[in-house]
UniProtKB/Swiss-Prot annotation:
<dbReference type="GO" id="GO:0005829">
    <property type="term" value="C:cytosol"/>
</dbReference>
<keyword id="KW-0686">Riboflavin biosynthesis</keyword>
<feature type="binding site">
    <location>
        <begin position="80"/>
        <end position="82"/>
    </location>
    <ligand>
        <name>5-amino-6-(D-ribitylamino)uracil</name>
    </ligand>
</feature>
<feature type="binding site">
    <location>
        <begin position="85"/>
        <end position="86"/>
    </location>
    <ligand>
        <name>(2S)-2-hydroxy-3-oxobutyl phosphate</name>
    </ligand>
</feature>
<dbReference type="InterPro" id="IPR002180">
    <property type="entry name" value="LS/RS"/>
</dbReference>
<protein>
    <recommendedName>
        <fullName>6,7-dimethyl-8-ribityllumazine synthase</fullName>
        <ecNumber>2.5.1.78</ecNumber>
    </recommendedName>
</protein>
<feature type="binding site">
    <location>
        <begin position="58"/>
        <end position="60"/>
    </location>
    <ligand>
        <name>5-amino-6-(D-ribitylamino)uracil</name>
    </ligand>
</feature>
<dbReference type="Pfam" id="PF00885">
    <property type="entry name" value="DMRL_synthase"/>
</dbReference>
<dbReference type="GO" id="GO:0009231">
    <property type="term" value="P:riboflavin biosynthetic process"/>
</dbReference>
<comment type="pathway">
    <text>Cofactor biosynthesis; riboflavin biosynthesis; riboflavin from 2-hydroxy-3-oxobutyl phosphate and 5-amino-6-(D-ribitylamino)uracil: step 1/2.</text>
</comment>
<keyword id="KW-0808">Transferase</keyword>
<feature type="binding site">
    <location>
        <position position="113"/>
    </location>
    <ligand>
        <name>5-amino-6-(D-ribitylamino)uracil</name>
    </ligand>
</feature>
<dbReference type="GO" id="GO:0000906">
    <property type="term" value="F:6,7-dimethyl-8-ribityllumazine synthase activity"/>
</dbReference>
<feature type="binding site">
    <location>
        <position position="127"/>
    </location>
    <ligand>
        <name>(2S)-2-hydroxy-3-oxobutyl phosphate</name>
    </ligand>
</feature>
<comment type="similarity">
    <text>Belongs to the DMRL synthase family.</text>
</comment>
<feature type="binding site">
    <location>
        <position position="26"/>
    </location>
    <ligand>
        <name>5-amino-6-(D-ribitylamino)uracil</name>
    </ligand>
</feature>
<comment type="function">
    <text>Catalyzes the formation of 6,7-dimethyl-8-ribityllumazine by condensation of 5-amino-6-(D-ribitylamino)uracil with 3,4-dihydroxy-2-butanone 4-phosphate. This is the penultimate step in the biosynthesis of riboflavin.</text>
</comment>
Amino acid sequence: MTGEGRPDRAVVAAHGIRLGIAASRWNAHVVDAMVERAIEAARSCGVTTPTVVRVAGALELPVVALELAHHHDAVVGLAAVIRGATPHFEYVAQAATMGLTQVAIQTGTPVGDGILTCDSMAQALDRCGLPDSAEDKGWEATVAALDCALVLRDLRSRAAAGMPG
């Protein structure tokens, strides 16, 4: 993992943005850290009270993200899918990721993809934002969703004012 090309871990001024976070209960040690980092990222961006809900697993994220998207300006889905000995990993990772993308496209609400798809628990721990992790995917997915919500807010306000986007 290089993180090459990743933007700086910046914050955006997202005061007034309503954020929903849906997180899996599978691989709780990893996902709990991602939730904590997502909440911290939201607060650093001015979103003081994000809605946080927990779901059974990664496959439940899209339907809950869809519901959150109806009442929030941005949504983040968080999970850790760890490869096992069967192809189940492939199906879960693809379905959950595609589901979050479909929610964003169908609703026009940005959905940050914080689904870790890792070959091992060690890889997941290295990406979940713990103090000794190399990456912080909960933070990154949250800032990305908030940033996109701000872009959409600006584009929509321009359109409402009759200005070109």
